[in-house]
Amino acid sequence: MGVYIVDSNFFIQAHRETYPLDVAFSFWNKVKELAIEGKIISIDKVKDEIYNKNNALEAWCKENLPDDFFKNTTDVISEYQQVVGWAVSKSAHYSPNAINEFLDADEADAFLIAFAMEDTASRTIVTQEVSNPKMKSKIKIPEPCAIFNVRFIKAIEVFRELRETF
């Protein structure tokens, strides 16, 4: 069985929109359980996106996620370079701002894809982003995933695939 690599929007959208921390305890308990079991993980860049807000979500993550939940991406530089090459090759389609944002060293998306590329047989990205190949103003995670054979699914599908309920 593989591992699910969660994007920052897995946490942020759940907290803001569908499963607020103060209401949906069972969801967050299940997230904690899956994290402790190593079924879901994330990367250092996602941690950086979540841990700069000084809010309830950041506090929950610090208190409930295992110390090794956020994996280091320094070992996926070769894969990251492939993602960079792809993004730059799409300059006739995407706006310069879209490419620059996608490749910003502080943004997680390109690094998530690179991390998953290191082992496409067992790593699946979890994101709420939806494919929109005609969009020129933003590179969505599904577009490069399709190019690099990286599997991606929405958050609720993780629970279905793992046959988990909350």
Predicted regions located by residue number:
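Active-site-proximal, substrate-binding regions of enzyme catalytic domains
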Residues: S8-A121, S131
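Acidic, PIN/NYN-like endoribonuclease modules and their adjacent C-terminal/linker elements
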Residues: A121-T124, V130-F166
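A structural signal for short, well-ordered beta-strand segments and their strand-loop junctions
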Residues: I5-V6, I41-I43, I125-T127, I153-K154
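Feature 3881 marks metal-assisted phosphotransfer/nuclease machinery
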Residues: M1-V3, A14, P20, A35, ...
